[in-house]
């Protein structure tokens, strides 16, 4: 976003916008430049239909979660008046930190949705295992399948407790960075495991698109990706439990060491 007088002009594009083309109000986070100098990150409000430079791209043919569109949004000389800018009170340099804090709350919600998908898949599998008969008895009486159902129920119970802990945040202010990340990691990976095992319980019967489990398996896959991948969230948790920033750039550690050495010399 280039600051030009009392306005900000945004050019660029953003992919995988959930609800793109449906939502009227758009909150855009962009890096702000003034006279060619990077000032930090700020938020900008644009209203679809009233902002000429806001364009909605094609809908992505998504693998799952097809109930709401995922689109590209294009910014072509999108002019935002200063009155529609959402700037951090601490200054633009704190804009990225504020954006990431908003993600922490979203992660608890995403983990909850993943848990709901997994719970639904488990309930379908549990019911089917008691109804489906093979070799003269319900398949739930076979020990191997019992173990699968027990593992599914155990993982669901653990995921639910992590989400409740992150949502209640009894030890501090919501959202807690570590608890939100832990809840999303475990719940999202549980959703993939449980939907996959539920498919196995059904066998060929649920490999069909006529039954809901194939949709659940597709929907579950997104939750280890969106809102921070499971791998990035592990880095977030690591930085919290080690109580140190973990740079992701090739020379990040060297820069931190130089900064620490410089501060020590100043003392």
Feature names for model-found ranges:
Residues 2-3, 18-22, 34-38, 63-67, ...:
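Solvent-exposed alpha-helices and their adjacent loops that cap or buttress functional pockets
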Residues 52-79:
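Flexible, small-/acidic-enriched active-site or ligand-binding loops
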Residues 62, 86-88, 136-137:
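Short beta-strand/turn micro-motifs at beta-sheet edges
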Residues 7, 11-56:
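A short core secondary-structure module
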Residues 17, 35-37, 51-53, 80-85, ...:
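Short, acidic Gly/Pro/Ser/Thr-rich loop/turn segments
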Residues 3-8, 74, 101-267:
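Alpha-helical interface subdomain recognition
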Residues 25-29, 43-45, 70-77, 222:
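Conserved hydrophobic/aromatic beta-strand scaffold that supports enzyme active sites
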Residues 76-97:
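Long, acidic (Asp/Glu-rich), low-complexity accessory segments flanking structured domains
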């Amino acid at each position: 976003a280039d600051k030009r007088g009392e306005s900000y002009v945004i050019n660029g594009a953003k992919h995988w916008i959930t609800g793109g083309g449906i939502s009227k109000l758009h909150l855009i986070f962009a890096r702000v430049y003034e006279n060619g100098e990077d000032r930090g990150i700020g938020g900008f409000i644009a209203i679809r239909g009233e902002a000429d430079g806001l364009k909605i791209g094609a809908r992505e043919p998504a693998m799952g979660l097809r109930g709401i569109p995922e689109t590209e949004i294009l910014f072509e000389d999108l002019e935002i008046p200063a009155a529609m800018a959402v700037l951090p009170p601490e200054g633009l340099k704190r804009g990225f930190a504020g954006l990431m804090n908003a993600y922490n709350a979203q992660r608890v919600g995403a983990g909850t949705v993943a848990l709901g998908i997994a719970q639904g898949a488990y309930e379908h599998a549990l019911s089917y295992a008691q109804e489906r008969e093979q070799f003269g008895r319900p398949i739930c009486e076979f020990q191997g399948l019992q173990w699968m159902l027990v593992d599914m129920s155990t993982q669901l119970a653990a995921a639910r407790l992590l989400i409740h802990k992150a949502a209640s945040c009894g030890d501090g202010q919501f959202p807690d960075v570590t608890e939100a990340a832990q809840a999303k990691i475990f719940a999202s990976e549980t959703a993939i495991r449980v939907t996959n095992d539920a498919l196995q319980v059904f066998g060929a019967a649920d490999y069909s698109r006529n039954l809901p489990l194939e949709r659940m398996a597709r929907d579950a896959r997104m939750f280890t990706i969106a809102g921070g991948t499971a791998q990035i969230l592990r880095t977030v948790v690591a930085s919290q439990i080690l109580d140190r920033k973990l740079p992701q750039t090739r020379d990040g550690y060297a820069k931190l060491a130089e900064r620490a050495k410089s501060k020590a010399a100043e003392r």
